[in-house]
From Swiss-Prot:
Keywords recorded for this protein, A-Z: Carbohydrate metabolism, Lyase
Protein's name in the database: N-acetylmuramic acid 6-phosphate etherase
Domain SIS: 66-229
Active-site feature positions: E94, E125
GO molecular function: carbohydrate derivative binding; carbon-oxygen lyase activity; ether hydrolase activity
Native source species: Parasynechococcus marenigrum (strain WH8102)
Domain of life: Bacteria
InterPro entries, per database record: Etherase_MurQ, Glucokinase_regulatory_CS, MURQ/GCKR, SIS_dom, SIS_dom_sf
């Protein structure tokens, strides 16, 4: 018996999965000229957007339930292997600079850890216990949320994490790119992004990866909107951590509060880099500590804080 025959998870036939089936449009992929090749990819890459649109109800449900838990101090974890895991890490890493969120609030957990970001560690995804262990190492608990990402829906690492989440009462959300009857996953919310067979058979870094990234973008951004980190379409909790973001903060102060650039620099410094505090201070005359107290009273919701004082921003 070979080492492959001895492991049922490794030797299982996955040919029935939508993501593993050959795409009839690309049977002569290697014979196409470059222009035809590019055109075919462009045409197929319209499918991820429709797949995400078709899953909008389950994505909306996920956003509301995640936001509710995060308001109560819970955290959001993305768990995956290979491309799926890397996309989770990418989305989580963007939350602190965009929304000034605590790095602990949204975390990406990748099979194989940081080294797997640069060098593929695909074999680690076959270890179901590893999914549970990696979550345990981060103190994952009943108040937290897990989005288990597995394009083909069969990854033991992700299945193990989702099973663990459900067993302790955490929110378990599955995200896969095959129908649920092809690969059922233990979860409270089931997000299925049906992008169809890949042009390069089985290469789920393509359409499946694109749809996954789109869905994660929506989830994290919509959750942060619900948490009050956005006013209108401005990221009013942006972290002023580099010159580009300082410039963005100053433009937000100008556009929302009518605050000129030089005054904005002074206010931003007094507010410790917080756009929200700077806007409240400029509009109300409150000191930084008083503005912070007002904001905390309204759970960080800038619009509510302004309304409580009878104030309005330039763009309300």
């Amino acid at each position: 018996m070979t080492r492959f025959q001895s492991d049922a998870a490794v030797s299982a036939d996955r040919g029935h999965l939508m993501t593993e089936q050959p795409n009839p449009r690309s049977t002569a992929l290697d014979l196409l000229d470059t222009a035809e090749l590019v055109t075919l990819f462009v045409e197929e890459d319209r499918r991820p957007q429709q797949a995400v649109a078709d899953a909008s109800a389950s994505i909306s449900a996920a956003v509301d339930r995640i936001a509710s838990r995060l308001k109560d101090g819970g955290r959001l974890f993305y768990l995956g292997a290979g491309t799926s895991g890397r996309l989770g890490v990418l989305d989580a890493a963007e939350c602190p600079p965009t929304f000034c969120s605590d790095p602990e609030m949204v975390q990406g957990v990748l099979a194989g850890g940081a080294p797997a970001l640069l060098r593929s560690s695909e074999g680690l995804e076959d270890l179901e216990a590893a999914g549970r262990e990696d979550l345990d190492q981060r103190g994952f608990n009943a108040g937290d949320c897990l989005v288990g990402i597995a394009a083909g829906g069969t990854t033991p690492y992700v299945r193990g994490g989702l099973s663990h989440a459900r067993s302790i009462g955490a929110l378990a959300i599955a995200m896969a790119c095959v129908p649920s009857d092809q690969a059922p996953l233990p979860c409270d919310i089931d997000i299925r992004l049906l992008t169809g067979p890949e042009l390069l058979t089985g290469s789920t870094r393509l359409k499946a990866g694109t749809a996954t990234k789109m869905a994660l973008n929506i989830i994290s951004t919509a959750v942060m909107v619900r948490l009050g980190k956005v006013f209108g379409n401005r990221m009013v909790d942006v972290s002023a951590s580099n010159s580009k973001l300082v410039d963005r903060c100053l433009r937000i102060l100008r556009d929302l509060g009518g605050i000129e650039r030089d005054d904005g620099l002074v206010l931003l410094d007094q507010a410790g880099g917080s756009v929200k505090l700077a806007l409240l201070m400029a509009s109300s005359g409150l000191a930084s500590s008083e503005a912070m107290e007002l904001l905390q009273t309204h759970d960080g919701q800038l619009r509510q804080a302004f309304a409580s004082r009878g104030l309005k921003l330039a763009q309300s």
